[in-house]
Swiss-Prot record:
SMART domains: AAA. Keywords: ATP-binding, Cell membrane, Membrane, Nucleotide-binding, Translocase, Transport. The gene is ecfA1. Belongs to the ABC transporter superfamily. Energy-coupling factor EcfA family. The keyword Transport applies. Forms a stable energy-coupling factor (ECF) transporter complex composed of 2 membrane-embedded substrate-binding proteins (S component), 2 ATP-binding proteins (A component) and 2 transmembrane proteins (T component). Its EC number is 7.-.-.-. This is Energy-coupling factor transporter ATP-binding protein EcfA1. It comes from Staphylococcus epidermidis (strain ATCC 35984 / DSM 28319 / BCRC 17069 / CCUG 31568 / BM 3577 / RP62A). One of its GO terms (cellular component) is ATP-binding cassette (ABC) transporter complex. It is an enzyme of class 7 (translocase). It is a peripheral membrane protein. GO terms for molecular function: ATP binding; ATP hydrolysis activity; ATPase-coupled transmembrane transporter activity. ATP-binding (A) component of a common energy-coupling factor (ECF) ABC-transporter complex. Unlike classic ABC transporters this ECF transporter provides the energy necessary to transport a number of different substrates. It is found in: Cell membrane.
Length: 269
């Protein structure tokens, strides 16, 4: 992808939760380009959430190898790897530990014994970046779903990660909240030079990515740019995925079957 060096590589990775169980992942190989947005897409049971656990060393591969910046992700190195990767989950409530927003964002910095003045400055910086500085003294649980995700992202950004993983982070948001959050994530990628990995079943979300990896039954089904992936509409439908809204409307209205974004569909109309 555009000559970018891979920050994460999966090399013939297989995984099973028990030695006598079926493989959740089977000989999976792919690379995540540094500084770009990769979306890992699949229906429930395709293995996408297992990949997120493997990336940060929560689980270890049964076979094959995972590299982070050429460093093996294994029991010996996983603590070092985790310093560089932040995760935002579907339900951010589980990540909140403080009574107000700014304390939650500061939590990771406190654990790193960051000096107080530096910590306050960093918290204000990242809350401003995610447009939540006006909620700094609010209780996290009083916020909307989209606002909670912004706070969770701020907490990750405070630690200056190289990689931000979004594990079904937009699933519980309404269309406006989802669109707003995805625009923010793209800004984070550009402004902070952070590699984005979104784990999702939602092809509308995947349209924002630079690279899409489609999983099916624990294997890589397709991999490429959005333009490459969405040329294969029938194949995507065959593995249980819903087409993005612009492509659905494109088919419904009888337009040509070329890849189309929201903006492109509006121009056709």
């Amino acid at each position: 992808m555009n000559g970018s060096n891979p920050i994460i590589e999966f090399k013939d990775v297989s995984f099973q939760y028990q030695s006598d169980a079926a493989f959740t992942l089977n000989r999976v190989s792919f690379s995540i380009p540094a500084g770009q947005w990769t979306s890992i897409v699949g229906h429930n049971g395709s293995g996408k959430s297992t990949i997120a656990k493997l990336m940060v060393g929560i689980e270890e591969p049964s076979e094959g190898q995972i590299l982070f910046q050429n460093l093996p992700v294994d029991s010996q190195n996983k603590r070092e790897v985790r310093k560089h990767i932040g995760i935002v989950f579907q339900n951010p409530d589980n990540q909140f530990v403080g009574s107000i927003v700014k304390f939650d964002v500061a939590f990771g910095l406190e654990n790193q014994l960051v000096p107080y003045k530096e910590m306050v400055s960093k918290v204000n910086q990242v809350l401003t970046e995610v447009d939540m500085i006006n909620k700094a003294d609010d209780e996290p649980h009083s916020l909307s779903g989209g606002q909670k995700q912004r706070v969770a992202i701020a907490g990750v950004l405070a630690l200056n990660p190289d990689v931000l993983i979004l594990d079904e982070a937009t699933t519980m948001l309404d269309p406006h909240g989802k669109s707003s959050l995805l625009n923010l994530v793209n800004e984070v990628k550009v402004n902070n030079h952070v590699t984005i990995i979104s784990i999702t079943h939602d092809l509308d979300e995947a349209m924002h990515a630079d690279q899409i990896i489609v999983l099916n039954k624990g294997t890589v089904f397709k991999q490429g740019t959005p333009q490459d992936i969405f040329k294969c509409e029938e194949a995507l439908i065959s593995v249980g995925l819903d087409l993005p809204f612009p492509l659905k409307m494109n088919r419904l209205l009888g337009f040509d079957s070329t890849y189309v974004t929201y903006e492109g569909l509006i121009k056709k109309l």
